């Protein structure tokens, strides 16, 4: 009974937190110029080498449907979420580090690319990607039957005994994500999901305090199981 109650409390608290963040993001977006999907597509396909901005399609695939397991699929991800991530790859000033870094704090290729992007670039390419359809025929899927039950348990109910909330509370039961803040994980590469959870856990990805707290209470086996399960959601 106590475990069931804890699960409800955690899920309810996270849902409220998600709603607050979403509302804040929408409010902050008010008054900004409307993003241009056509310009975003041009940058996505061609890049801008004069500023060190590589063509996004090289790593993230046609229409944001990546076929490279370590590179995320970005098709139909929330616009606000994508803009925030691009910002987080950049350092706020010369004395600080980006809040999104690779293993052991190393800067990723995205840090160099984001440094060459303007605010308009970020908004345009994010808007373009948010409108792209997911290619479900080539999307990643669950492949590990032996961890399916464990992954499903964590996704739907979390690990209340360790304070790990249900992933579904913010990423939705079907993995579609939450508009404005939380990404789609359905069809995402499990290797990428697992890597990000480990980066949250280590603190090398420092742009999500709530995710750090969650990942810090998960074992490698937990991470592998729920990452594979999430990939298979539709």
Locate the predicted segments by residue:
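Bacterial N-terminal signal peptides that target proteins for export
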Residues: 1-15
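Short microdomains enriched in Cys/His and/or Lys/Arg
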Residues: 78-89, 189-201
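Disulfide-stabilized extracellular ectodomain repeats and their linkers
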Residues: 41, 53-56, 71, 79, ...
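Electrostatic cytochrome c docking/interface patches
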Residues: 27-50, 131-160
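Axial heme c-ligation environment in periplasmic c-type cytochrome domains
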Residues: 67-75, 89-132, 137-141, 178-184, ...
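C-terminal segment of classical bacterial N-terminal signal peptides
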Residues: 14-28
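The canonical Cys-X-X-Cys-His
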Residues: 40, 53-63, 125, 164-174, ...
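The feature marks the first
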Residues: 35-95
């Amino acid at each position: 009974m106590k475990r069931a109650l804890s699960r409800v409390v955690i899920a309810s608290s996270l849902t409220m937190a998600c709603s607050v963040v979403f509302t804040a993001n929408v409010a902050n977006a008010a008054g900004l110029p409307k993003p241009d999907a056509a310009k975003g597509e041009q940058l996505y396909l061609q890049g801008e080498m004069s500023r060190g901005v590589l063509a996004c399609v090289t790593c993230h695939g046609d229409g944001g449907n990546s076929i490279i397991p370590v590179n995320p699929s970005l098709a139909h991800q929330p616009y606000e979420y994508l803009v925030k991530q691009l910002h987080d790859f950049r350092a706020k000033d010369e004395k600080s580090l980006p809040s999104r870094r690779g293993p052991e704090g190393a800067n990723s290729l995205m840090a160099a690319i984001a440094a060459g992007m303007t605010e308009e670039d970020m908004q345009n390419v994010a808007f373009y990607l948010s409108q792209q359809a997911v290619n479900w025929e080539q999307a990643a899927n669950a492949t590990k039957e032996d961890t399916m039950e464990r992954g499903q348990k964590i996704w739907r109910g979390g690990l209340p005994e360790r304070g790990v909330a249900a992933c579904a509370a913010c990423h939705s039961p079907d993995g579609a994500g939450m508009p404005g803040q939380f990404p789609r994980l359905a069809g995402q590469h499990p290797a990428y999901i697992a890597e990000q959870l480990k980066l949250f856990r280590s603190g090398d990805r420092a742009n999500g305090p709530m995710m750090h707290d969650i990942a810090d209470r998960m074992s490698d086996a937990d991470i592998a199981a729920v990452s594979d399960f999430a990939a298979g959601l539709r």
